[in-house]
């Protein structure tokens, strides 16, 4: 029988068994999951992109709604 896959919790680093039994995976607990969500909401985490990529997204190609 194979060993269950274990990953580190992204928030606290605790070992976490990656299985359907763990409702919080990849986190070890609801607390760590909420800490991570709060960091995203506070913009402490960001998805990498080039400078000005947000400006390109809103470049004025679309007519404004009135």
Curated annotation (Swiss-Prot):
One of its GO terms (molecular function) is zinc ion binding. Keywords: Metal-binding, Zinc. The lineage of its organism: Bacteria, Pseudomonadati, Pseudomonadota, Gammaproteobacteria, Pseudomonadales. Binds 1 zinc ion. GO terms for biological process: regulation of DNA-templated transcription. Inhibits all the catalytic activities of DNA gyrase by preventing its interaction with DNA. Acts by binding directly to the C-terminal domain of GyrB, which probably disrupts DNA binding by the gyrase. Residues 45-66 are annotated as: Disordered. This is DNA gyrase inhibitor YacG. Interacts with GyrB. Pfam families: YacG. The gene is yacG. Its cofactor is Zn(2+). Zn(2+) binds at residues 9, 12, 28, 32. Belongs to the DNA gyrase inhibitor YacG family.
